[in-house]
C-alpha cells in the first residue's frame, strides 16, 4: 500500500492553511486517489496549538508515519511544502531515515520530494528558481504592470533567497527584488536595487507559503514598521499582494511536479521484495531494506 504525506512547517491560522496547504492537498488527492494522503505539521508546537484550537486534528510527522505503519502502508511519499531545505526539513529527513531502517515499521520505501527552491537548472536539471519566479509573476501579472515586484521572505539567512535574486537579475524576472526580514538580502539592499530600477510603483508579495494574518499585518498593516509604511516613507506607491505563495495555483503545480518526480524516481529504483533481501545497511541512496531519495 502507498501513502502520501504533505509536510509543512504549520500555522495556527486555519483559513490561511486551507487556502494554501488545503488547496495543494485537494490536487494531490485528485491526482493520487488510490493513495492515503495525510497532512502533517513539522513544528510540534504548532501541532499542539492547532489541536487545542480546532476540532480537525493535525498529526506530527512521527504520528503520521506510525499510523501509516499500522494501516499496512509500506511505500511512503513525502512532499515538503516548504520553500527551502531548512532545519525543519533536515530534521524530518533524519526521522524518515529512522523509520525506513527500523524493522518495527516494515517500510519498503520512503521517498522525499524537493522543496520549492532546490534545483539550479544546471546539467539538464530543472530550474526551480526560474520556475518559481515565472509562477509568481504570472499570478500577479495584472497588478504588477509597470511596477517593480518586491518579494519579502519572512526568515533569516538562506542562500536560496540570494540565489533567487540573482536568477531574477540574470533575466528570469528583471523587475523583481528579493529581501529577507532578518537576514540577507536586507531591506536596505532591496532599496538600492529599487532605486536603480527607477519604478515608483511597487507590488509587495510575501515570499511565504501561508499568508497568515500576522504576516499580512507586518506587510501592510497600519503599524509604523510595516513594509508598506517603510516603503511609503521612501516615496514609493505601494500595493500589497494579500496571499501566501501556497494560494498561487502555479506554485501549487510546482509542488505537484516535485511529488510526481519523487514517485517516478521510486518506480525506477524499486527494490526486490523484502523477504528476498538481506538486511544490510549501506551509505548508498538505495538501501537493502528500502529506499529514501
Spans of features found by a protein language model:
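Extended amphipathic ligand-handling, pore-lining, and cofactor/metal-binding catalytic surfaces
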Residues: 1-203, 208-293
